[in-house]
Amino acid sequence: NTGGKAPRKHIAHKQAKKSSAAAATGGVKKPHRFRPGTVALREIRRFQKSTELLIRKLPFQRLVREIAQEYKSDLRFQSQAVLALQEAAEAYMVGLFEDTNLCAIHAKRVTIMP
């Protein structure tokens, strides 16, 4: 015995009931749904592989200009300066979420809270 899960036992009458129910409703098959958390884990893996910025550039640029306006009016930004700010902001947020996740795991929770 190699361990692991035992093979599932298929019950014939349950399968027959399902197929007859689909035939009774006119063959309308309900849409496929992944189990809760599966899509989230897939997205986590996808975003961890990628290096592109996740916040849209123009909304971030508007936010930077809005915040800078409070300190000095008529400021101009090089495009590289805004990109550097965005890289720093996203790196900070990723670190914050990593720490938040560790705190949630420590508290025996799965969901992170504000």
From Swiss-Prot:
Gene3D superfamilies: Histone, subunit A. Keywords: Chromosome, DNA-binding, Nucleosome core, Nucleus. CDD domains: HFD_H3 (cd22911). Residues 1-17 have a biased composition (Basic residues). Belongs to the histone H3 family. The keyword Hydrolase does not apply. One of its GO terms (molecular function) is protein heterodimerization activity. InterPro entries: Histone-fold, Histone_H2A/H2B/H3, Histone_H3/CENP-A. Residues 18-28 have a biased composition (Low complexity). Pfam families: Histone. Core component of nucleosome. Nucleosomes wrap and compact DNA into chromatin, limiting DNA accessibility to the cellular machineries which require DNA as a template. Histones thereby play a central role in transcription regulation, DNA repair, DNA replication and chromosomal stability. DNA accessibility is regulated via a complex set of post-translational modifications of histones, also called histone code, and nucleosome remodeling. One of its GO terms (cellular component) is nucleus. It comes from Stylonychia lemnae (Ciliate). Residues 1-32 are annotated as: Disordered. This is Histone H3-6. The nucleosome is a histone octamer containing two molecules each of H2A, H2B, H3 and H4 assembled in one H3-H4 heterotetramer and two H2A-H2B heterodimers. The octamer wraps approximately 147 bp of DNA. It comes from the Eukaryota. It is found in: Nucleus; Chromosome.
